[in-house]
C-alpha cells in the first residue's frame, strides 16, 4: 500500500491553511503573488459538515480507479505516486466520478481543463506542504505498512 495524507477531524478547525499551502507549493514561483480566486487550485479540500470539518485528499490507491477509467491514460504512477500528466488530460471528468474518496477535481484555467489530485508534494524534499502548514497538526502522512506493523507490535 502507498503512503497518503490523512486528516483527524477532531483536530481540524477548518481554517483552510492546508489548501493555501498546497496552492503555493504547486506554483512555479512558490509565492502568493499570483494566487487569485480564478487560479486557486488546491489538491486538498476542506469539507465542512454540520458538526465537523476535515480535509479530503487522494489515498494513492494501489489499483487507482481514477487511472483505470482515464480514456487517455493521463493518470500514471511514478515512484509510487499517482500523478496527472496534464498534457494528456482531456477534461472528461471520468476520474472525478471514479474516485471513491472525492479527491479528484477538474478545473478550467485559461480555457484548459486540468485534473487535480494530491501528489504528496513529490517535488518537495520536506514532504507535503499541507502537513507542514497545518496549525493544529490535524494532517499527517500515513504509511499503511508502518501503521500495520505498529498495530501488530501493540497487540503482542
Where are these regions (language model features)?
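Non-ligating segments of multi-cofactor redox enzymes
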Residues: 1-156
Amino acid at each position: 500500500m502507498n503512503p497518503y495524507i490523512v486528516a483527524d477531524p477532531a483536530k481540524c478547525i477548518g481554517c483552510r491553511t492546508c489548501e493555501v499551502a498546497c496552492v503555493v507549493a504547486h506554483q512555479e514561483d512558490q509565492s502568493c503573488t499570483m494566487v487569485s480566486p480564478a487560479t486557486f487550485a488546491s489538491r486538498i479540500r476542506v469539507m465542512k459538515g454540520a458538526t465537523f470539518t476535515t480535509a479530503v485528499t487522494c489515498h494513492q490507491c494501489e489499483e487507482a480507479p481514477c487511472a483505470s477509467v482515464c480514456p487517455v491514460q493521463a493518470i500514471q504512477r511514478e515512484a509510487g505516486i499517482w500523478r496527472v500528466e496534464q498534457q494528456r488530460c482531456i477534461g472528461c471528468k471520468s476520474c472525478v466520478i471514479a474516485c471513491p474518496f472525492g479527491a479528484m477535481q477538474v478545473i478550467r484555467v485559461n480555457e484548459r481543463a486540468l485534473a487535480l489530485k494530491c501528489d504528496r508534494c513529490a517535488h518537495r524534499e520536506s514532504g507535503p506542504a499541507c502537513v507542514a502548514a497545518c496549525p493544529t497538526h490535524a494532517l499527517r502522512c500515513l504509511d499503511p505498512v508502518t501503521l500495520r506493523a505498529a498495530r501488530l507490535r501493540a497487540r503482542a
